[in-house]
């Protein structure tokens, strides 16, 4: 049916609430199941229709069947298919009843579709079926299903849920404790049923045959070619050949308890307590009635979470320009995603002290890059530097990291002492300022709108920080900075300081443990930030990009209330 085509009803129930379509969901010997709609609730339902002239011979039988199906509609259990209503169409000689619709068909269809089902899942199904049988057998009056088989057990595969259905042939035991009519499927019929003197234990026998089929994926007595052969074996106490092909001894013992003679057969309630069915719910994601699983909120698993469904492959390019200081190169990494988003990351490179391979490894770690190898990134860094420094050479020599990528003349003098002094001075500028602007500026219009977490690595546009005068108050340092996310100075211009202090007073407790916000929210794009700074401030800012630290927790706040280890620092 075309999705835009209006579905036409073939017929409706007497109230007009349920409308039946021509689409057939299943067909049995006496019943056809159609798809229907409940107009009141707006849900799809199953419309079962029984041709009465094929199963009934008198008006007494007709009234009895209608009464029993009507009573069955009052049953309410999680392992019993839900009945909504039933009625007899006198003109068409049909019995109709509405039940809930199942998404995965019958248990036989489901098991034949998925052959490699774990025994623990099969045990879960068995427990659900037995719970339904216990409910039926302890009902007042007791209810015998009389036709329990995998074709009459229905599955919601996305929930791991099974329910007993097709109760139209069930029989209620009223004043007596046994029934006397022969009805059912020969392969699943207990020996005493042929003798026309039986009770609810015939359902336990049928359950044993169902479990045998679930374990072996074989229809019971498939070796027989005629119902008469099946009858002869059943009344003679001969078990189906599939029983002897069960590899699990405990499973075979469990099935055998169901298939013994009625005098030795246990009830469904006793069978439910068998050690073989002992529940081990620790392995399951869903169990019947257990609801949703608890989230795995621990540090190791949180690190593996992806905030978007699809991994985006990235394109990367690196360009550079001479820095304001000797021996410094300002590098820009451009990262472009397939969805059109892009990121620019700016960082300094000290040609006398840094090596491209070390910086590349740092990039992979700090920016969580998974689709580029450090060696590939190092080559791009070398290419950018060699375009500015003619005698820069690249060597793949991991054994000599201090000489790696540093082959040039003395046109640049060493700045190691300057870097050291800058690092020492940075220890005097503290993280409270960083925490304040992280908290206050989350919704500033200057935040970059061009980045979104790809599931591969953090694509934050990091803020470049200013260096302020020596008159700023000295504060204790709480975490290190990296070349990709430098630490914000705590000394602010007078107009900004008050705003930051106000934010800090309300958010300090949160900022002290969670200095970050969700990864897929970008920080301020550095180039847009530069538009608001004077050339002097820009020059001072560049001198702060000198150290390598840990950026793991900068710019990220855990979406769950879980404990996190303090970020490790590195140089």
Swiss-Prot record:
Its GO CC terms are: cytoplasm; nucleus
Task: Give me the reactions it catalyses.
Answer: L-seryl-[protein] + ATP = O-phospho-L-seryl-[protein] + ADP + H(+); L-threonyl-[protein] + ATP = O-phospho-L-threonyl-[protein] + ADP + H(+)
- In this chain, ATP is annotated as bound at 99-102, 149
Tell me the superkingdom of the source: Eukaryota
- The EC number of this protein is 2.7.11.1
Q: Which GO terms describe its molecular function?
A: ATP binding; protein kinase activity; protein serine kinase activity; protein serine/threonine kinase activity
Q: Does the keyword Manganese apply?
A: no
Catalytic residues, chain numbering: 166
Q: What family is this? A: Belongs to the protein kinase superfamily. Ser/Thr protein kinase family. WNK subfamily.
Q: Which protein, by its recorded name, is this? A: Probable serine/threonine-protein kinase WNK4
Q: Which gene encodes it?
A: WNK4
């Amino acid at each position: 049916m075309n999705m835009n085509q209006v579905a036409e009803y073939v017929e409706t129930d007497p109230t007009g609430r349920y409308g039946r379509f021509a689409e057939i969901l299943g067909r049995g010997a006496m019943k056809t199941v159609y798809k229907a709609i409940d107009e009141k609730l707006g849900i799809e339902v199953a419309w079962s229709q029984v041709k009465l002239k094929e199963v009934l011979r008198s008006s007494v039988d007709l009234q009895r069947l209608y009464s029993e199906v009507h009573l069955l509609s009052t049953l309410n259990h999680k392992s019993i298919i839900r009945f909504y209503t039933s009625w007899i169409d006198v003109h068409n000689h049909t019995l109709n009843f509405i039940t809930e619709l199942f998404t995965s068909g019958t248990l036989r269809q489901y098991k034949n579709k998925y052959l490699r089902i774990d025994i623990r899942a099969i045990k879960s199904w068995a427990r659900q079926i037995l719970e339904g049988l216990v409910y039926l057998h302890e009902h007042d009056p007791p209810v015998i299903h009389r036709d329990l088989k995998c074709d009459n057990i229905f599955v919601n595969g996305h929930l791991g849920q099974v329910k007993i259905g097709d109760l139209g042939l069930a029989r209620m035991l009223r004043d007596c404790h046994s029934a006397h009519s022969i009805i059912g499927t020969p392969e699943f019929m207990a020996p005493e049923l042929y003798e026309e003197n039986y009770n609810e234990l015939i359902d336990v026998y049928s359950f044993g045959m169902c479990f045998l089929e679930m374990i072996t994926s074989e229809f019971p007595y498939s070796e027989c070619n005629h119902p008469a052969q099946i009858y002869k074996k059943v009344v003679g106490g001969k078990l189906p050949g599939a029983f002897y092909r069960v590899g699990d001894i405990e499973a075979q013992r469990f099935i055998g308890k169901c298939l013994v003679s009625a005098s030795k057969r246990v009830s469904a309630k006793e069978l439910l307590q068998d050690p073989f069915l002992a529940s081990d719910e620790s392995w399951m994601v869903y169990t019947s009635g257990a609801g949703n699983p608890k989230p795995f909120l621990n540090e190791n698993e949180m690190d593996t979470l992806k905030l978007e469904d699809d991994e985006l492959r990235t394109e990367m390019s690196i360009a550079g320009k001479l820095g304001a200081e000797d021996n410094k190169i300002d590098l820009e990494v451009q990262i472009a995603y397939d969805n059109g988003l892009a990121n620019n990351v700016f960082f300094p490179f000290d040609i006398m002290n840094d090596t491209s391979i070390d910086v590349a490894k740092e990039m992979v770690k700090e920016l969580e890059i998974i689709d580029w190898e450090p060696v590939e990134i190092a080559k791009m860094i070398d290419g950018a530097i060699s375009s500015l420094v003619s005698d820069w050479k690249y060597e793949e020599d991991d054994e000599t990291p201090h000489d790696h990528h540093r082959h040039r003349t003395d046109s640049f003098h060493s700045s190691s002492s300057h870097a050291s002094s800058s690092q020492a001075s940075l220890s005097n500028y503290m993280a409270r300022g960083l925490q304040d602007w992280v908290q206050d500026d989350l919704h500033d219009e200057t935040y970059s709108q061009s980045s979104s977490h790809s599931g591969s690595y953090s694509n934050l546009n990091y803020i470049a920080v200013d260096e302020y005068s020596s008159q700023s108050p000295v504060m204790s340092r709480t975490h290190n900075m990296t070349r990709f996310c430098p630490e914000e100075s705590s000394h602010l211009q007078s107009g900004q300081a008050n705003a930051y202090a106000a934010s800090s007073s309300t958010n300090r407790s949160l900022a002290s443990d969670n200095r970050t916000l969700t990864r897929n929210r970008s920080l301020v794009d550095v180039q847009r930030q530069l538009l608001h700074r004077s050339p002097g401030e820009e020059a001072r800012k560049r001198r702060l990009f000198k150290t390598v630290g840990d950026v793991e927790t900068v710019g990220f706040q855990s979406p769950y209330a879980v404990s996190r280890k303090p970020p490790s620092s590195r140089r």
